[in-house]
Amino acid sequence: MKKKILLLGSGELGKEFIIAAQRLGQYVIAVDFYDGAPAMQVAHEKEIINMLDGNLLDQVVKKHKPDLIVPEIEAIRTERFYEYEKQGYQIVPSAKAANFTMNRKSIRDLAAKDLKLLTAKYLYASSEKELAKATKILGFPCVVKPLMSSSGKGQSIIKSPKDISKAWEASQTKGRTSATEIIVEEFISFKSEITLLTVTQKNGKTLFCPPIGHRQERGDYQESWQPAEISEVQLKEAQRMAEAVTKELTGFGIWGVEFFLTEDQVYFSELSPRPHDTGMVTLSGTQNFNEFELHIRAILGIPIPEVTQERKGASAVILASTDGKIPEVRGLDIASEMPESDFRIFGKPITRPYRRMGIALSYSTKGEGISSLRKRAILLASKIKVD
């Protein structure tokens, strides 16, 4: 069952996915806009193109004729996926899923209006004037997001009328496309946020991984831990929502479904139809299969009977602090002295401030608490420098 996989996007998540795929004997071509991307370092072949150029994307698909097309990022001309499906290519998880989830308007309307899932109240705005009007309706604080962006790019919190102009400017210059429309959300005063990794299978039931807690800064993940603290009632509701939305989007693979938790409510936030950055905590052995192993098994149609929690774990990001090329890694000897810990250096060839260059991992088989594991992962990350 050797398949040819075209991986669109070659970051750290793609690198771990390729490693998992190769362990099952698969052949992978890694694609990205720059040479030397992490996943290219472990792929059988590579292609360097602008994936937002549909014609270039067509050429790569025609050249390689893959059995599976697996998106790893959102900055892709995903509209082409519908045509690829008509031509007989398998899109992971599906063309519909890839297109809906890259656009916050599509996925939010699907969740809130079609599936009636609980979400933050929201409005759309296509001008600074409309944004100001939306803030009057939703109140302060509120959250502004481009319809298409990732890792917090272009997002901001409006706390008062004086923030409106700056928030509008950020949404227009830091998003992923030239589209002017944005989404404006009420600010949910949540006690925590979780990622529920959800696995849809071709010939098996939908599975849920133990919930993952995470902390964000600048709109990007800084640390995650598993399992997250959540009541049984809220967990069941999150699982119900995750199953509903993934079933509607169709397809097989792993999904990172994000929720806000208040004292008594579960709010659907958004989802990614692929391995999730917060899910890298599973590399610390928290589950019988990590998220990348689950993804490749699901898309190949290999049955996954169950997902079991094996131990507790935590992750913390290792960030660059300067601009540079061919970075030097320091501190691995010191970091390696910590017990029940591990790390991954992604191999990115270029640094810039706050760019994620690796992760630190901690785990426990002796009943150690999550708080202690988080502290150890953060301490470990601080010992490693990639600049």
From Swiss-Prot:
Residues 109-300 form the ATP-grasp domain. NCBIfam families: PRK09288.1 (NF006766), purT (TIGR01142). One of its GO terms (biological process) is 'de novo' IMP biosynthetic process. Its EC number is 6.3.1.21. The keyword Nucleotide-binding applies. Belongs to the PurK/PurT family. One of its GO terms (cellular component) is cytosol. Homodimer. Mg(2+) binds at residues 258, 270. Keywords: ATP-binding, Ligase, Magnesium, Metal-binding, Nucleotide-binding, Purine biosynthesis. GO terms for molecular function: ATP binding; magnesium ion binding; phosphoribosylglycinamide formyltransferase 2 activity; phosphoribosylglycinamide formyltransferase activity. Involved in the de novo purine biosynthesis. Catalyzes the transfer of formate to 5-phospho-ribosyl-glycinamide (GAR), producing 5-phospho-ribosyl-N-formylglycinamide (FGAR). Formate is provided by PurU via hydrolysis of 10-formyl-tetrahydrofolate. It catalyses: N(1)-(5-phospho-beta-D-ribosyl)glycinamide + formate + ATP = N(2)-formyl-N(1)-(5-phospho-beta-D-ribosyl)glycinamide + ADP + phosphate + H(+). The gene is purT. Gene3D superfamilies: 3.40.50.20, ATP-grasp fold, A domain (3.30.1490.20), ATP-grasp fold, B domain (3.30.470.20). ATP binds at residues 104, 145, 150-155, 185-188, 193. HAMAP family: PurT. N(1)-(5-phospho-beta-D-ribosyl)glycinamide binds at residues 12-13, 72, 277, 348, 355-356. This is Formate-dependent phosphoribosylglycinamide formyltransferase. It comes from Leptospira borgpetersenii serovar Hardjo-bovis (strain JB197). The keyword Metal-binding applies. Pathway: Purine metabolism; IMP biosynthesis via de novo pathway; N(2)-formyl-N(1)-(5-phospho-D-ribosyl)glycinamide from N(1)-(5-phospho-D-ribosyl)glycinamide (formate route): step 1/1.
